[in-house]
């Protein structure tokens, strides 16, 4: 209802309106509905970093890094909007679709990324695949080998059961840049907050000493859950989503 009322306000020339609510969850729901109508209205309170693309990407990498060949997390990384791996989006999407169809559905048959690349390049017709001969897919194998190379520098930080959390946080930041193809992921207010997250994660980890590598991803998520990214878009001239404090300082028609 709130989203409809805000949209209705725009249909009256010169009118302005605002949703005033102390509930961050309600503000996010209304903003999501408005976005479906191409109205980018971010709550003035900001957005949890975990709900931002860069935040979700970093947490995904924290879980993927320990077992990069795990099918579900590997696909999530390859399909993420930040992933480029040196290819244009259309080409990458085509290759990822082929890899998913040929090798990542059903039971896991590979142990490592190199094993997966080898199976794509030199298909093995398992018993259940006798009716459908698999074709060599060298371009798909090349993509897997490329992401394996990008992942390689981060392995040292997560190799042992007990790891240096600060080194692990820095490794995740470098891995994110490598997969995305540059430092542009830190752009804007969400990117700046994500960079602050890496710094804070490193400092907290350093204070704790060594930690179990299996616990790092959960710890990273706990740290990120407390962080809010400020709105990265200019305020709409006629409609807004405010908290009670902002509402006391401004007025709208509705």
Question: Where are the language model's segments positioned?
Answer:
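Polyanion-engaging groove/track-forming segments
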Residues: 1-254
């Amino acid at each position: 209802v709130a989203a409809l009322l805000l949209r209705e306000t725009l249909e009256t020339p010169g009118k302005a309106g605002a949703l005033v609510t102390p509930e961050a969850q309600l503000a996010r729901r209304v903003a999501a509905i408005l976005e479906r109508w191409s109205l980018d209205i971010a709550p003035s309170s900001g957005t949890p970093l975990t709900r931002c693309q860069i935040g979700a990407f970093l947490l995904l990498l924290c879980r993927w890094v320990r077992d990069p060949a795990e099918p579900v997390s590997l696909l999530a990384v390859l399909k993420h909007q930040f992933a480029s791996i040196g290819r244009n989006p259309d080409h990458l999407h085509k290759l990822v679709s082929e890899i998913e169809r040929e090798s990542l559905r059903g039971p896991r048959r590979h142990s490592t990324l190199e094993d997966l690349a080898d199976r794509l390049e030199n298909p093995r017709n398992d018993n259940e695949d006798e009716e459908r001969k698999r074709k060599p897919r060298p371009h798909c194998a090349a993509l897997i080998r490329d992401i394996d190379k990008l992942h390689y520098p981060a392995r040292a930080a997560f190799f042992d059961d007990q790891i240096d959390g600060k080194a692990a946080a820095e490794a995740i930041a470098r891995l994110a840049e490598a997969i995305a193809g540059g430092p542009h992921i830190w752009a804007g207010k969400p990117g700046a907050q994500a960079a602050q997250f890496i710094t804070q994660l490193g400092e907290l980890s350093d204070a704790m000493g060594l930690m179990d590598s299996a616990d790092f991803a959960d710890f990273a998520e706990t740290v990120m859950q407390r962080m809010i990214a400020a709105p990265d878009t200019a305020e709409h001239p006629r409609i807004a989503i405010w908290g009670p404090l902002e509402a006391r300082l401004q007025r709208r028609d509705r």
